From Swiss-Prot:
Function: This is one of the proteins that binds to the 5S RNA in the ribosome where it forms part of the central protuberance.
Keywords: Ribonucleoprotein, Ribosomal protein, RNA-binding, rRNA-binding
Organism: Exiguobacterium sibiricum (strain DSM 17290 / CCUG 55495 / CIP 109462 / JCM 13490 / 255-15)
PANTHER family assigned: RIBOSOMAL PROTEIN L25/GLN-TRNA SYNTHETASE, ANTI-CODON-BINDING DOMAIN-CONTAINING PROTEIN (PTHR33284), RIBOSOMAL PROTEIN L25_GLN-TRNA SYNTHETASE, ANTI-CODON-BINDING DOMAIN-CONTAINING PROTEIN (PTHR33284:SF1)
GO cellular component: cytosolic large ribosomal subunit
Single Gene Ontology MF annotation: 5S rRNA binding
Protein name: Large ribosomal subunit protein bL25
Superkingdom of origin: Bacteria
A Pfam entry, by short name: Ribosomal_TL5_C
Chain spans, region Disordered: 188-225
Assembly, per entry: Part of the 50S ribosomal subunit; part of the 5S rRNA/L5/L18/L25 subcomplex. Contacts the 5S rRNA. Binds to the 5S rRNA independently of L5 and L18.
HAMAP family from the UniProt entry: Ribosomal_bL25_CTC
Acidic residues bias spans: 204-217
Length: 225
């Protein structure tokens, strides 16, 4: 999968030029890497936002710059934390026949069988590192969890095997598990505690009753004497 993004070389200074570009709806960035010298660039911010929204950050981006095409990956994306705008992007030019490593999202698909019976599906790992040629990098890895019962879990080693890429993250790391609902477990503990308390009270009442009967019998015996 590859998308095309038209970019333009830009001057680093003056600062007012950068402000003007942003005012015009342009985002700023730089491209460097395989057979490419570090080059400051600008591009339509909305176009890249759409690319990321539709394909994720691991998509192969073919930059059209100065009449030539440069195959790149997004190496670093700096977003404004208050507004959904791009502050700066680093594109790294890549060699198409060499593997590269990136992080990709893990997406759980379906409703776990254990969740239908009152369990809770807990995801503990959200990304894994994968290795592939730039054009084979996955947008995400989907994992079917419909067969998971309460007490079952999935590790990295259980992720679907794909011929286009390989998972680099260690296989024994847990991805997700179906656990007993905390609320239900707490209710069970409360019920057990109440049952034990009732049993203790009953035993105490029996002991007290037996003791009272013995004392009464002893008093009656003394009266007769």
């Amino acid at each position: 999968m590859s998308v095309t993004l038209k970019v333009e070389e830009r001057e680093v200074r003056p600062r007012s030029l950068r402000k003007q570009l942003r005012h015009e709806g342009k985002a700023l960035g730089v491209v460097y890497g395989y057979k490419v010298e570090s080059t400051p660039i600008s591009f339509d911010e909305k176009e890249l936002v759409k690319v990321i929204r539709d394909h994720g950050e691991n998509v192969l981006v073919a930059l059209q710059i100065g009449g030539k095409k440069v195959n790149t990956l997004i190496n670093k994306l700096d977003m404004d934390i208050f507004t959904p705008t791009i502050k700066h992007v680093e594109f790294i030019a890549v060699k198409m026949d060499e593997e590269t490593e990136v992080e990709t999202d893990i997406v759980l698909v379906g409703e776990a069988a254990g969740a239908k019976l009152g369990g809770f599906l807990s995801q503990t790992l959200f990304k894994v590192t994968v290795a592939a040629t730039p054009d084979k990098l996955p947008e995400r890895i989907e994992v079917d969890v419909t067969e998971l019962a309460i007490g079952d879990s999935i590790t990295v080693a259980d992720l679907p095997e794909e011929k286009d890429f390989r998972v680099v993250t260690e296989g024994d790391i847990q991805v997700a598990a179906v656990v007993e609902s905390t609320l239900e477990a707490e209710l069970e503990e409360i019920e057990e505690a109440e049952a034990e308390a009732q049993a203790t009270d009953a035993d105490t009442a029996t002991d007290d009753s037996e003791q009272t009967s013995e004392e009464q019998a002893e008093e009656n015996k003394e009266d007769k004497e």
